[in-house]
Amino acid sequence: NFMQHIMTVMSSHGRAGVVLPDNVLFEAGSAGEGIRRRLLEQFDFHTLLRLPTGIFYKPGVKANVLFFEKRPPRADGKPNTKALWIYDFRTNLHFTLKKNPLDTKDLQDFVACYQVGLLGQRRETERFKRFEIDELLKRDKLNLDIFWLKDESLDDVDSLPTPDFIAAEIVENLQAALEAFQAVADELAVKP
């Protein structure tokens, strides 16, 4: 699979940031659990960014960015990951491709929390939490689909979008997808 390939071809001390669907974090079976275990033990899997829905053409896609570095095995045999920092950029945030697109400014808090080059100086915030390796390894099937923020939209039925708003969002997503596909079709038509 894609993730296994990346992990295999990375050079020692190489770094990666990989966008993957949610199921990689909790997929049952030996393959899914094995990938997560290898990621935690052989790599310094230091950061997980939970992406909001509405930023991809396919509506409802739940994805994450995994940030990790390949390390040589530790002399003490312990995992290379000491702690995983998770930034929840999904709960109570909503983006669309046209009316409310994701912008660079929306990621400023994550960038500030990430502390490029200064991982040891990170501080927890409401959206950014640290999970120790011992805690992660005890989780059933190494499930890394971790969340702590309460989704307010699930409690407040009155705050749910109206049917016409939902319909308008569907139309917007379909139009954006159609435009993207039309651009591909136009490009293919030009080539001999």
Residues covered by each model-derived region:
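A conserved structural/catalytic subdomain of Rossmann-like adenosyl-cofactor enzymes
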Residues: 1-192
